[in-house]
């Protein structure tokens, strides 16, 4: 009981119980058989409501020039430092033309018809600069795995890679093109198997921009995963423990078990598996992605156990959810969640687009799987069950195979 109220306990021994807190002192008496624990939790009063004034747009009388100071600086469609509003990730020393500011963001000119936003902390203003770049042409380089285009410019300039049909590469602030924007299309429907993008990348090397689009993958009908490179990412690790389940299991430990089982299942089917971590060690999020990219992985599968913010009822949330950022990865997520929910009997907690660091990677089809809610007693009991873990690995592998077949 908690304060005399009977708490439902799952057969596994786990439970989740929500008690609203009052302002000030909250006393909890927890009894289980002859054992009793007492806790005191203080809830401070809410701070007085202030008058928030949204920042206003200030347009400059004269254009300003800036250089990007940090690699992978997000160029955004709105002046908000979060969410799915990223246009591109800009490299250090890329020149920008600025025509205004709003709060902590500068407004960036993108051709004559479009603007973007960049956080002020990612740029430094320059005394002078040039507004337009010159595109001198491009070369096509054929390779076994990629369509490669090398665009020759006289300086770096903002760009955008658009996942559409056709796939578009746009260079902004380029002279001698309509709206100061160069656009080249790549016929995905004609060039790719069933019109599916399978990974791409674009970045400057000096003043040359190198665009790589992965070619269609030829699979073995009897063994679709044979020689397919797959990065398996066990979430968290080391000092980053992740969430804690109802029975004290740590997400970092449970996900490593899942990752090893998935590695075994994929290798059994002929896949080449890259593990972002093999033990209880801390790995930076970018380090995980860079490892997958250095090994030229086709898929990046990150495994996690879900949780909820304080105040949310764990009993009301359950099931398997999958997150992606770039649209090219959504069909993969759809195929995997279909297998996981049907084979494991888990509730479908939906496929969603979200700006998580490990899925903001275009080189591989990148997804993050929340296998279940570790703070939900029912989900947690399943997730620590060894037989369930093996079935999960099989369901994920089946989903990847279905994606390659369809």
Q: What are the residue ranges of the model-derived segments?
A:
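Second-shell loop/turn segments in exported
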Residues: 80-83, 240-253, 276-282, 319-327, ...
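Active-site-adjacent mobile loop/cap segments within catalytic or ligand-binding domains
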Residues: 295, 299-302, 307-309, 321-324, ...
């Amino acid at each position: 009981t908690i304060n005399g109220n009977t708490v439902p306990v799952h057969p596994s021994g786990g439970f989740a119980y929500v008690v609203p807190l009052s302002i000030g002192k909250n006393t909890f008496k927890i009894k289980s058989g002859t054992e009793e624990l007492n806790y005191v939790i203080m809830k401070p009063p809410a701070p007085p409501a202030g008058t928030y004034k949204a920042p206003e747009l200030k347009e400059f009388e004269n254009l300003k020039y800036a250089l990007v100071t940090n690699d992978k600086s997000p160029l955004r469609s709105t002046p908000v430092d979060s969410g799915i509003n990223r246009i591109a990730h800009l490299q250090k020393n890329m020149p920008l033309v600025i025509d205004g500011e709003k709060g902590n963001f500068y407004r960036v000119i993108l051709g004559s018809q479009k603007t973007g936003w960049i956080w002020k902390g990612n740029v430094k203003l320059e005394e002078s600069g040039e507004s337009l770049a010159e595109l001198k042409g491009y070369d096509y380089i054929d390779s076994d795995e990629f369509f490669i285009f090398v665009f020759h410019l006289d300086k770096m300039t903002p760009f955008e890679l658009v996942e559409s049909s056709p796939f578009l590469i746009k260079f902004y602030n380029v002279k001698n093109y309509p709206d100061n924007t160069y656009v080249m299309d790549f016929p995905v429907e004609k060039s790719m198997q069933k019109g599916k993008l399978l990974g791409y990348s674009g970045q400057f090397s000096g003043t040359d921009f190198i665009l790589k689009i992965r070619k269609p993958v030829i699979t073995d009908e009897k063994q679709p995963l044979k020689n397919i490179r797959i990065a398996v990412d066990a979430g968290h690790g080391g000092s980053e423990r992740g969430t804690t389940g109802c029975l004290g299991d740590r997400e970092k430990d449970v996900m490593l078990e899942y990752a090893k089982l998935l590695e075994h299942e994929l290798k059994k089917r002929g896949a080449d598996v890259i593990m972002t971590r093999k033990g209880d060690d801390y790995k930076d999020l970018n380090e995980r992605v860079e490892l997958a990219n250095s090994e030229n992985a086709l898929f990046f599968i990150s495994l996690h156990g879900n949780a909820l913010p304080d105040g949310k009822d764990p009993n009301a949330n359950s099931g398997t959810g999958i997150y992606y950022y770039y649209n090219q990865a959504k069909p993969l997520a759809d195929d995997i969640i279909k297998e996981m929910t049907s084979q494991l009997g888990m509730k479908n907690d939906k496929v969603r687009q979200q700006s998580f660091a490990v899925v903001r990677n275009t080189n591989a089809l990148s997804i993050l799987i929340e296998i279940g809610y570790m703070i939900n007693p029912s989900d947690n009991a399943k997730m620590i069950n060894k037989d369930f873990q093996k079935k999960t690995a099989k369901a994920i592998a089946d989903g990847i195979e279905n994606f390659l077949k369809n």
